[in-house]
Regions:
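Non-catalytic positions within long, well-ordered alpha-helices that form the structural scaffold/packing
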Residues: 22, 86, 94-95, 124, ...
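Active-site-adjacent C-terminal substructures of enzyme catalytic domains
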Residues: 129-130, 139-258, 272, 282
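Divalent metal-coordination and catalytic microenvironments
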Residues: 25, 32, 102, 133, ...
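Flexible loop residues that form catalytic
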Residues: 34, 107, 157-159, 267, ...
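C-terminal cap of metal-dependent C-N hydrolases
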Residues: 241-243, 261-297
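Short coil/turn connectors at secondary-structure junctions
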Residues: 24-27, 55-60, 96-98, 171-172, ...
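Metal-coordinating catalytic core of metallo-dependent amide/deamination hydrolases
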Residues: 1-14, 19-20, 27-141
Length: 297
């Protein structure tokens, strides 16, 4: 129908963004749905990810974020939309093999803690890995819930409390830091990196690439800003965009994000004079040559 993009059109629109990531040596990319908010449109977005995966050598991980916000037509009967997600959208996605994970945005203006639990439990029953966007705008306690339910990661975390940090540390839940969002939204609240570090919570960094709050595909800049704005140390930032990112996606055991015998052999060559320089020049893309699975792009 008019004004609605097909999976083919969505894949065409996404291709230049994926190419920008590949040019930086980003070989593994998570792509989320969440801008459809109906069965038909969520499936189209995830089908676009599958199409992209056929057209590009990148390793793509599809996540269904149907639980992004409650669409306007369901505002009066929120439970109806939660049930649409748990009983219709997620089962259809799982049955078609279109996503390996499900994500929920639990925050003010999005889903409540109780709704998040319903959606995460439904996803887990379907065999989907789970992740959460949360503690971004307000402290909800969803970090504790995510850890309890075995979610792979919690994104944002500007307002996570001590209990949430402790729970994530115990469960090994990855904290995904998103400096693009705090920068673009001019949010004075920053994630408590010192407390996360002290507790031993693994920290990843991502672009949060999206039109509303983080319009960027520059993962190097995000790693650089994580050092400048969030106080990560250079070695932490490098791990954050390699092995810890792979861990958040459930790929670390497959040797993604690391140079190991029998691993993925995704390699990036740079002419930077030393590894710290990778995190120094704001906006620099230090990648000069890129290999995925041992094959040069």
């Amino acid at each position: 129908s008019h004004g609605e993009a097909s999976a083919e059109e969505l894949a065409d629109l996404a291709a230049p963004r994926l190419d920008a990531l590949l040019a930086q040596g980003v070989t593994t990319v998570e792509v989320k749905s969440g801008y459809g908010l109906s069965l038909e449109h969520e499936l189209a977005q995830l089908e676009a990810v599958a199409l992209l995966g056929e057209r590009r050598p990148a390793r793509l991980v599809a996540t269904c974020l149907a639980a992004h916000i409650v669409p306007d037509e369901h505002k009066e009967r929120r439970g109806d939309y939660v049930r649409l997600v748990t009983d219709v959208i997620l089962p259809a996605v799982a049955a078609r093999g279109l996503a390996s994970a499900a994500d929920v945005f639990c925050d003010e203006g999005a889903f409540t803690l109780a709704e998040a639990r319903e959606i995460l439990e439904a996803a887990a029953r379907l065999g989907l890995r789970t992740r959460v966007h949360g503690e971004q705008l307000t402290a909800t306690g969803v970090a504790t819930l995510a850890a309890e339910l075995g979610a792979a990661s919690v994104d944002h975390l500007e307002h996570v409390d001590a209990a949430g940090i402790a729970a994530m540390a115990r469960a090994g839940t990855v904290a995904v830091l998103l400096p693009g969002a705090t920068t673009f939204l001019a949010d004075p609240a920053l994630p408590p990196v010192k407390a996360l570090r002290a507790a031993g919570v693994p920290m990843a960094v991502a672009t949060d690439a999206n039109p509303g709050s983080s319009p960027t595909t520059h993962l190097w800049l995000m790693a650089q800003l994580a050092c400048v704005s969030y106080g990560l140390m250079p070695h932490e930032a490098l791990r954050a965009v390699t092995v810890v990112g792979a861990r958040a996606l459930g790929l670390a055991d497959a040797g993604v994000g690391r140079i190991v015998v029998g691993g993925a052999a995704d390699l990036v060559a740079t002419d930077a004079p030393g590894w710290r320089h990778l995190l120094y020049g704001l906006g620099d893309n230090p990648a000069r040559r890129v290999w995925i699975g041992g094959r040069e792009l």
